[in-house]
Regions:
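Dinucleotide-binding Rossmann-like beta1-alpha1 core, especially the glycine-rich loop
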Residues: 52-130
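Beta1/beta-strand and adjacent pyrophosphate-binding region of the FAD-binding site
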Residues: 4-18, 35
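Conserved Rossmann-like nucleotide-cofactor binding loop
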Residues: 18, 42, 208
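Central helical "cap/lid" subdomain
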Residues: 195-232
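Glycine-rich FAD pyrophosphate-binding loop
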Residues: 27-48
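Core beta-strand elements of the Rossmann-like FAD/NAD(P) dinucleotide-binding domain
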Residues: 5-8, 190-200
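A conserved short coil-to-beta-strand element within the FAD-binding core of flavoproteins
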Residues: 125, 173-187
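Helix-loop-beta segment of a Rossmann-like dinucleotide-binding subdomain
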Residues: 4-7, 85-94, 108, 115, ...
Length: 232
């Protein structure tokens, strides 16, 4: 049994795909004295019912770059950490019903080409070669993304967690953070098992992120602009 730590360089609050990705990448870049706290089981929050779509399409350079990196990571992660993971590269065809939409696709394609992605503008006459049942009478064209696909979010989370553990990161499940305080230049994360002093705190609490964010407002933090709603 691992003793509960009292210090760390970074404490991550939240054990979904964002939290485990943060821990994995911190460890990969040498910040191995990092800890993840999860109030329940890994993926028990918003991650377990995520759709798992893996597009590279975006009109934002930064988001496209992040998605490109993610797709590259997913291709080799299962083998790297020795954890089975359902990741399917299926390709996708996005449809344009106007010339303005085609201009948006052309801009996206240009950004993608610069970042090394093989996005392709499709003429209407060529689109049925990809999807023969497509109705094309009202289309202006399309954008084909051969790298689009889907992934199992729970398996991805567990793979990232395993990779982080392999590099020395620590994960504590069923250990909710219950508050934070500040002592000098350090943060103190409070849990029922004890307090952890650290340099940095990462709020990866998913649909609890707004609630966790409120803890930081007395120290200059801002409200996380989100609301949690129940649905079927």
């Amino acid at each position: 049994m691992v003793d509960f730590p009292t210090t760390a360089r970074v404490v991550i609050i939240g054990g979904g795909v964002v939290g485990t990705s943060a821990l994995y990448h911190l460890c990969k870049f040498g910040w191995k004295d990092s800890i993840l706290l999860e109030k329940n089981e890994l993926t028990a929050g918003s991650t377990w019912h995520a759709a798992g779509n893996c597009p590279s399409f975006s009109t934002s350079w930064a988001i496209m770059n992040m998605q490109r990196y993610s797709l590259e990571l997913y291709r080799g992660l299962a083998e790297e950490v020795d954890y089975p993971m359902n990741y399917h590269v299926t390709g996708s065809l996005r449809l344009a019903h106007s010339r303005n939409r085609m201009k948006e696709f052309e801009r996206c394609r240009s950004m993608g080409k610069y970042q090394g992605m093989d996005l392709d503008i499709m003429q209407v006459s060529d689109m049925k070669d990809i999807y023969p049942f497509l109705e094309t009478h009202d289309l202006a064209g399309g954008l084909y993304d051969p790298d689009d696909g889907d992934i199992d979010p729970a398996q991805l989370t567990q793979a990232l967690a395993k990779g982080a553990r392999n590099m020395g990161g620590k994960i504590f499940r069923f250990t909710p953070a219950i508050g934070i305080s500040r002592e000098g230049d350090e943060w103190v994360v409070h849990t029922e098992k004890g307090n952890i002093r650290c340099e940095k705190v990462v709020n990866a609490a998913g649909y609890y992120a707004q609630r966790v964010g409120e803890w930081f407002k007395p120290f200059g933090g801002r409200t996380v602009p989100m609301v949690t709603m129940s649905h079927q």
